[in-house]
């Protein structure tokens, strides 16, 4: 029974995070489709086209973040605190390095990549604009994803749910709705809202992880 409780305690927040991501995608499509500044179909198509290309960035970051759950959990269970700290530094540094590479790649080469997927000049323009803004968000996305998975590996899963809710719904979707629907700004203001949410979430996740690691350090002192 205790094992089942632990599985649900760690698994339910992760599952709810995926639900929030799907809900956020729905909200963004609705907001972009409600914009008066561009064609709704062009706005949604540009967002979805950019999202498909973005998977090139997300695949390695998700792989690193997911592997950290196993490695951190294994070392935490074995009370190898020295290895916990080293693997955290390694995972974060590699995630940031990869994200910076993709940021540079998308910012400078998106105008050459996107025409492969569409012939529409308006969709190409909006997608390039998307990457010119979101390119700056990728390092912060990497930090937020990695930190939340590290905390999950340490047996604390609810930060992942809270951080996803904070980033996707409370900040990103709210700012997009305010800028595009209320103020009537161009749709790229919605992506500025996403950039802001990614920066704030990365800062919160780092502070949260730092607090948890302080508790881990106290456990290490007791064990030693």
Regions found by a protein language model. Name each.
Residues 1-27, 52-60, 135, 161-165:
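Hydrophobic faces of transmembrane alpha-helices in multi-pass small-molecule transporters and flippases
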Residues 1-12, 72-137, 179-224:
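Short alpha-helical transmembrane segments in multi-pass integral membrane proteins
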Residues 14-26, 62, 94-103, 107, ...:
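Hydrophobic alpha-helical transmembrane segments in multi-pass membrane proteins
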Residues 22-50, 56, 74, 112-121, ...:
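Helix-terminus/linker motif at the lipid-water interface of multi-pass membrane proteins
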Residues 24, 28, 68, 109-110, ...:
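Hydrophobic/aromatic residues in alpha-helical transmembrane segments
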Residues 29-32, 62, 106, 149, ...:
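Structural signal for membrane-spanning alpha-helices in multi-pass inner-membrane proteins
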Residues 47-110, 141-163:
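Small-residue-rich hydrophobic transmembrane alpha-helices
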Residues 52-55, 121-147, 166:
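Alpha-helical transmembrane segments of multi-pass membrane proteins
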